[in-house]
Amino acid sequence: MASMSLFELTRGFADIPSALANISILDLVLDSRQVTEGSGFIAVQGTQTDGRRFIADALDRGASLVLAESPDGKISDSRVIGMPGLKKHLGELAKRFYGDPSRQLALLAVTGTNGKTSISDYIGQLLRLLGESAGTIGTLGARTRSGESVASQNTTPDIISLNRQLADWVDQGIRFAAIEASSHALDQSRLDGLTLHTGIFSNLTRDHLDYHENMVAYQQAKLHLFQDFCPDRVLFNADDENTFPAREFASQSALGISLRDASADVFAQVTSEAASGLSFLLHSPYGSTSITTKVHGRFNAFNVTAAIMAVCGLGFAFSDVAAAASYLQAVDGRMQAVGGGEDVRVVVDYAHTPDALASALFTLETSCPGDLWVVFGCGGDRDSGKRTEMGRIASGLASKLVITNDNPRTEDASVIASQIASGCMPNCDGADVLIELDRAAAIVYAIKSARPGDTVLIAGKGHETYQIIGRAQHAFSDVEHARQALAARGVADV
């Protein structure tokens, strides 16, 4: 286990009493519950709780010392050290303690409203298909060379956890890592001090306005990935002008990816959206070829292309990367088919924003011979302004709507559902709308009621294995409930 003295860790940041200078630190943690013997506990004010409240707990658990922005005067212990400006130095402290791991591997970061998980996962898959070791960090947790996952509470972990994970991968010989960079993480400086090889900006559409207040602030948070880190290479969406400013901050090169403009730096021309998967012609500075994949959704042409360009930017041959793309697997909870689709086609997708819901429904509508059903809701204690918009979109593209719970948290679930339904009414065009707040019952109703040839989209939760009601998490999986409903219908999962 690596260790560092307090003097080495804080040199240049704080004046440490000589009697404490040689205290050995075995790890850094922000959560007192993770403290083990010899840990250094970092006590700072967070967005949801104040770490300084847990100084005593950290010491009881065996912390060798506590660094606190402004220590609680009630605790008189020489191991509690005040460090003004501690929070803004977290990135540098973590980088120093863990040996600056982002410089020892090629780190790629993906930001954007939609597509972060898919792009980062595709990058990891492509690298593994090419025989390389790669890790990914994001909504699906931390995944290593063989694809196994370790759950993470946030899309982008705190900067200490990030550095610890990257350092562990460096020790394992992993040479590449792709991470999701959420707007919250960028705004809260959770990536500070990292060195980026590639930055990718997928798109910007409405989301998180409960946090950012307006789209300008939301865009600025995303742009921190480029302004603050100046990646060697930048990939942006040539079809979304909100992403254009990112190209100005590339240290070496920037490429715009388009699904519409043949004159763009990179052009992905969709040629087929079949039950077997998505195909497109790819034209890029690295070469041109036809790409055939097993993934679904026109929007995935952008995601796959971004991953291909990112991996080519690491120095891999275009022909090899393009060939590997045909073996890409669908990302958990992203246009994930449940069952064989011979009777009723059932798809689970994470779509929880207006744009993502529209993209998923449009994709399924084009290949649905029968009625298109959608089971969805909107999260509580989150941007309430998108609820009516999602109702409008759903009623405009689907024939049958079942509005239900989607992590209502502390809000009244019936109020959320009514707000969604109010958006459906002016645009209903004959769509049937049912409110069933029990999400399990809603899934059963849609799958049981659908006729052969119909498609049922279960949107909003994707890979999640829980439902948040009040402040408690309850076990819940859209995929498992869909499988059970199909089994009750007499359809075996494949």
Locate predicted features.
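Phosphate-binding loop of NTP-binding sites
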Residues: 90-238, 244-250, 305, 367-368
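Acidic, Mg2+-coordinating active-site environments of NTP-dependent enzymes
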Residues: 68, 73-77, 172, 187, ...
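Short internal beta-strands
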Residues: 64-70, 200, 235-238, 373-377, ...
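Short, ordered loop/turn segments at secondary-structure junctions
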Residues: 70-72, 139-140, 183, 204, ...
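Short, active-site-adjacent cap segments at secondary-structure transitions
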Residues: 73-74, 142-144, 185-187, 241-245, ...
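ATP-dependent carboxylate-amine ligase
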Residues: 1-18, 37-40, 50-53, 286, ...
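N-terminal leader/targeting and accessory segments in enzymes
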Residues: 1-92, 96, 241, 267-269, ...
